[in-house]
């Protein structure tokens, strides 16, 4: 569920913020287990919530940190896995789930700004596909938030082991991936 992470690692639904001008909001984006499908219950990973909870109520220059767990797994991309897009030889048609998640994050940022949180005090963060989402949002809309924290932004499969990145180098591995899976490779390049 979406809501603010508490110090005790639970999630309190809602967007209640007392004194929004003196808060720093970190929007946390989870990863995705099923890259393009809708799975409502897959958005709270206990180990990640515990890490995020350690930031709650910390202060920077008199401003308290609040961490918002943003559950955005309840919708699918236009070509979900059911349509076999991962094995497609053609480019992805429509919006991928990650593109839609970027849009949802931008909407959430605007809600926080409307409540009174200054843009310069809103930070996007994410793990795994949420980390890639963070990079996508910041590269396309750097003016919308103060910055981002992206960690372990592995998304779209384990290219490192499957394509022997360590042995052949990243360029050769990505070329092999593009040859075997041109549809996903095009999407990866576009994003």
What role is predicted for each listed range?
Residues 23-24, 65, 121:
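Alpha/beta-hydrolase fold active-site loops
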Residues 37, 65, 69-99:
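Cap/lid segment of the alpha/beta-hydrolase catalytic domain
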Residues 16-60:
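Short, surface-exposed "cap/lid" segments of acyl-processing enzymes
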Residues 136-188:
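Hydrolase active-site cap/lid region
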Residues 125-130, 134:
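Gly/Ala-rich beta-loop-alpha elbow adjacent to hydrolase catalytic centers
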Residues 1-17:
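A short loop-to-beta-strand scaffold at the N-terminal edge of the catalytic core in hydrolase folds
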Residues 37-41, 79-82, 136, 160-163:
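Short, solvent-exposed loop/turn and secondary-structure capping segments
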